[in-house]
Amino acid sequence: MVTSVKVRAPSSTANLGPGFDVFGLALDAFHDEITLTKKPWRGVRILTADDIPKDPQQNTAGLVIKSMKQKFKIKSGIEMRIKKGVPAGFGMGSSAASAAAAALACNRLFNLKLDNKSLVKCAGIGEKASAGTIHYDNVAASLLGGFVVVKTKPFDVIRLEPPKDLVLCVAIPKLKVPKKKTKVSRAVIPKTVKLSDLTENLSNAANIVSGFLLKDSDLIGRSIQDVIVEPARKHLIPGFSRVKNNALNAGALGVTISGAGPSVIAFCKKSQNVKKVAKSMEKGFSSAKIDCETIICKPSIGPKIRV
């Protein structure tokens, strides 16, 4: 009988420009690790050396486990060890990686036999702890790997395999980010938009999906354009415009804010000089007197489970 399960789930980037709350892409840059162990008592206990809430109600992964315990009438106590590898608050899907790993581990530990859609819905509940609302783009990417498209009414999630030549460069500025940063960054998004802006974003979003279907990195890159959310959020990231322009001038196919920011992500191909793109992004942040770390990574195939 299985008494303990360990899951390692990848970081992710959401939105990809025009796909706000709809698109997600798993990245092999960072990982979170969750270990669930059955215990004789009834509650949920979190053990971690990281600076995150230990109250399950305030913790992304804890919220997922509490919800699944209630929904599936799990009587066993659960000890959860959390090892954070995804930097929190930088638009890399940190909360989602923990939520995804927790949902997958719980499914395996208690043999729930949930399908992918059900797992994504369970993991999405955890986002309420960090973002204040339930959304599924990052958790779907961390759970399923690859590129994901989320539909909410009715709920559905589609996974597509990324092109093999797609490479990402993520610039992570060394900024002090507020707690509940995702909630703060969502507050600046306009409540109403012009029809022409909506049309432009829809066109770009459709072309991004087409690019993943056709395995065309160039089409994906030139469609990474957002005229609604990015303009509203870019003022929260010092030096963003310079970072973006520098990366494009260095050969990046497309550049946008990674998730809710403040990280900036450039889409490239393996055949390009991606290190040149990375250096150009560092110089962009440097012009705003901001240090940054650049990570060159590729799409992740998804989480790993160990029993």
Model-inferred region functions:
Residues 1-90, 104, 108-114, 145, ...:
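ATP-binding N-lobe of GHMP and related small-molecule kinases
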Residues 8-10, 26, 142-144, 151, ...:
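Short beta-strand segments
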Residues 11, 29, 172-177, 227-228, ...:
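Glycine-rich beta-alpha junction loops
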Residues 37, 141-153, 266-269, 306-307:
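Short beta-strand-to-turn element immediately C-terminal to the catalytic PLP-Schiff-base lysine
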Residues 59-71, 205, 243-245, 280-281:
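Short, well-ordered amphipathic alpha-helical segments that serve as non-catalytic structural scaffolds
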Residues 75-154:
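Gly/Ser-rich oxyanion-binding loop with an adjacent helix/lid
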Residues 165-245, 249-250:
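Acyltransferase
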Residues 212-307:
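Glycine-rich, charge-dense phosphate/pyrophosphate-binding loop(s)
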